[in-house]
């Protein structure tokens, strides 16, 4: 190899190395910005606190701390499998399946529950979900009671409805009886908004649960 060819070869190698380092640095910066991506087949879990004081939750070594009253954490990913979940002062065994989403719910005076959250993949519409953890059959309607949105959701079950993005005023009904008017909620494309209903008898507590908005 003559000196000129050797020089060109080293120049190309140096350029390739510098580009590789730059690409690695860009990926590192992107990782720092967006956080680690979930490995394929992960399970996802969040916490909803139906109580009146802050709540700490853990699943295995994954922590969901300082969950505000009537608030929720964001989802965190972890390997699928069997774990012990610690919800405040109570614990329960949980089994998390691959590519599945769950909410750990803490209820005042009751045992914590693991609630499955079927994933939603329609990016053009929003999904309204009623997670009914009460003992009554419930219906989500427009605030005037004239139109059913999610009808006849049985105790300890959920009901879904895909709708166009909109800001709406809704109410929860037990048969023809209005249980509660709900806070106005804005539904965005590709978003799942859950109405969690806890409590029993005449003391039902419906609360909208959305993924927290992250600050820039």
UniProtKB/Swiss-Prot annotation:
Any Pfam family matching the protein: AlgF
Signal peptide per UniProt: 1-28
Protein localization: Periplasm
Primary localization: periplasm
Keyword tags: Alginate biosynthesis, Periplasm, Signal
Pathway assigned in UniProt: Glycan biosynthesis; alginate biosynthesis
A biological-process GO annotation: alginic acid biosynthetic process
Gene Ontology cellular-component terms listed: periplasmic space
Protein family (similarity comment): Belongs to the AlgF family.
Protein name as catalogued: Alginate biosynthesis protein AlgF
Natural source organism: Pseudomonas aeruginosa (strain ATCC 15692 / DSM 22644 / CIP 104116 / JCM 14847 / LMG 12228 / 1C / PRS 101 / PAO1)
């Amino acid at each position: 190899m003559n000196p000129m060819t050797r020089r060109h070869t080293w120049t190309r190698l140096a350029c390739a190395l510098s580009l590789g380092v730059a690409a690695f640095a860009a990926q590192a910066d992107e990782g720092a910005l967006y956080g680690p991506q979930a490995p394929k087949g992960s399970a996802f879990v969040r916490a909803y606190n139906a109580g009146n004081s802050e709540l700490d939750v853990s699943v295995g070594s994954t922590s969901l701390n300082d969950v505000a009253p009537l608030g929720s954490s964001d989802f965190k990913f972890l390997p699928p499998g069997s774990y012990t979940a610690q919800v405040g002062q109570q614990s329960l065994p949980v089994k998390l399946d691959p590519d599945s989403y769950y909410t750990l719910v803490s209820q005042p005076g009751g045992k914590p529950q693991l609630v499955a959250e079927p994933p939603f993949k329609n990016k053009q519409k929003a999904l309204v979900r009623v997670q009914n953890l009460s003992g009554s059959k419930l219906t989500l309607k427009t605030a005037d009671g004239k139109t059913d949105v999610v009808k006849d959701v049985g105790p300890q079950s959920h009901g879904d409805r895909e709708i166009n993005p909109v800001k709406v005023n809704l109410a929860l009904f037990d048969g023809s009886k209005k249980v509660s008017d709900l806070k106005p909620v804005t539904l965005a494309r590709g978003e799942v908004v859950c109405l969690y209903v806890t409590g029993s008898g005449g003391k039902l507590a419906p609360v909208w649960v959305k993924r927290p908005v992250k600050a820039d």
